[in-house]
C-alpha cells in the first residue's frame, strides 16, 4: 500500500458547503496513520488557527507516546479570475473563477498566501473572492499549487476541448511554480444504484484524468490524487445533502437541485489506495508535498495600532493614569482657566487626527 495524506479538504469554514469539524478530521487522520493533512477552504483561511492549535495539542500526546508529530498544512482553494481580478463583467464570465489549491510550504509561504487571500477579498471580490495570475506570480514564493477539481483551469479547458488553452495554463504554472506545481486527479464514482447522487461528475473526472496523466508525462509534472473532502465519514453524506439544500434554498425533493456525488468523505489511506491503485505515484506524491512543508508557528503577539503621544502628556503609562474620557475632552475643549474654547464636535475631530484615525471616519 502506498502512503497518502489529504491535500484537498473543506472544513465547516467552507460556509454552507463543508461540514467537517477540524478536530474530527485530525483525529481521523491520526487514527488512520496519516502523517499530516491540509485544509483548503473555499476562498478563506478561517480554520488555520484551529488546525494549528489542535495539532499542537495532539502532537504533545504523540510525543509522550514516542510517535512522530502530525504536520498541519495551511492552504486555501482559491478562485482564479478568468481574466483579471479587477474585471467585473457578468456577461464575460467574471463571476467566480477557476479553482486552484494553494498550500504554504513555510512561514514565508504562509504570509504570501495570506496576502493572496486578502487581496482576493479586498480587490478581487465579484460573487467570489478572486485572485489572478498577476498576484499569483507576484506572491508565488514558497507556495505549492495543485490544479484542483474539474473546475480548475486545466481540467475545465480539457473538458471544453481546448487543449491549447490547457497546455498554455500548464506552461504558465510550471514557469511560475516550477516543481511545486502538481496536476490533480479525482474520482468520485457512485457505486450504489439506489443512492440519489450526482453521477455526471465521475465520467467528466475520468475524461479529464486521462488527459492529465498524458500531460504529466509530456511536461514532466507530477500527479497527486485528492478526494475533495467535504464531510468526515461516509455516514455523513445525507446530512451534508441537507446542508446543500440550506445553501441553495432548495427542498430535498426538488428534482432539479444541486447534488454532490456523496463520495466526498475524508477517506482512509486504504480507501484512496483502492481508488487510485493504477496510479500509485499520485498517492505517494502527496507525501512528497508533505515533506516539502515545514513545521512552523503562526502564533503572533497582538498587533496594536500606534498612537503618537505629545511630549507634554508624558509616558504611555502616565497618560493612561492621567486621562479619562472626560479629562481627555476637557484637555482639548477648555483653556487653563476652564473656559470652553472648542466644541465637542471639534474636539472629536482633533482627537481623531491626533490618533491618526481621521481617514477612517
Please place each PLM-identified region on the residue numbering.
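Phosphodiester-processing cores and adjacent nucleic acid-binding clamps
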Residues: 1-361
Amino acid at each position: 500500500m502506498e502512503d497518502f495524506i489529504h491535500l484537498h479538504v473543506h472544513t465547516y469554514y467552507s460556509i454552507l458547503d463543508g461540514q467537517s469539524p477540524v478536530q474530527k478530521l485530525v483525529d481521523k487522520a491520526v487514527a488512520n496513520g496519516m502523517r499530516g493533512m491540509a485544509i483548503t477552504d473555499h476562498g478563506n483561511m478561517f480554520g488555520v488557527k484551529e488546525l494549528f492549535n489542535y495539532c499542537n495539542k495532539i502532537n504533545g500526546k504523540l510525543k509522550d507516546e514516542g510517535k512522530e508529530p502530525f504536520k498541519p498544512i495551511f492552504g486555501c482553494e482559491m478562485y482564479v479570475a478568468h481574466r483579471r481580478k479587477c474585471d467585473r463583467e457578468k456577461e464575460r464570465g467574471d463571476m467566480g473563477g477557476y479553482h486552484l489549491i494553494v498550500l504554504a510550504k513555510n512561514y514565508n509561504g504562509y504570509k504570501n498566501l495570506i496576502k493572496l487571500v486578502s487581496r482576493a477579498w479586498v480587490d478581487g471580490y465579484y460573487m467570489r473572492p478572486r485572485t489572478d495570475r498577476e498576484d499569483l506570480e507576484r506572491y508565488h514564493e514558497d507556495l505549492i499549487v495543485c490544479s484542483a477539481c474539474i473546475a480548475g483551469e486545466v481540467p475545465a479547458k480539457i473538458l471544453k476541448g481546448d487543449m491549447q488553452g490547457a497546455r498554455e495554463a500548464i506552461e504558465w504554472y510550471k514557469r511560475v511554480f516550477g516543481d511545486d506545481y502538481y496536476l490533480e486527479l479525482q474520482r468520485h464514482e457512485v457505486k450504489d444504484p439506489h443512492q440519489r447522487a450526482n453521477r455526471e461528475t465521475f465520467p467528466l473526472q475520468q475524461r479529464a484524468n486521462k488527459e492529465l496523466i498524458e500531460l504529466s508525462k509530456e511536461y514532466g509534472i507530477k500527479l497527486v490524487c485528492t478526494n475533495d473532502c467535504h464531510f468526515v465519514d461516509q455516514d455523513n453524506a445525507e446530512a451534508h445533502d441537507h446542508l446543500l439544500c440550506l445553501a441553495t434554498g432548495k427542498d430535498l425533493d426538488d428534482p432539479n437541485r444541486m447534488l454532490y456525488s456523496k463520495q466526498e468523505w475524508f477517506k482512509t489511506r486504504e480507501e484512496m489506495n483502492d481508488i487510485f491503485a493504477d496510479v500509485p505515484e499520485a498517492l505517494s506524491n502527496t507525501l512528497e508535498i508533505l515533506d516539502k512543508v515545514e513545521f512552523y508557528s503562526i502564533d503572533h503577539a497582538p498587533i496594536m495600532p500606534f498612537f503618537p503621544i505629545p511630549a507634554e502628556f508624558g509616558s504611555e503609562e502616565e497618560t493612561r493614569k492621567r486621562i479619562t474620557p472626560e479629562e481627555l475632552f476637557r484637555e482639548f475643549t477648555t483653556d487653563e482657566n476652564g473656559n470652553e474654547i472648542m466644541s465637542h464636535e471639534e474636539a472629536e475631530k482633533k482627537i481623531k487626527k491626533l490618533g491618526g484615525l481621521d481617514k477612517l471616519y
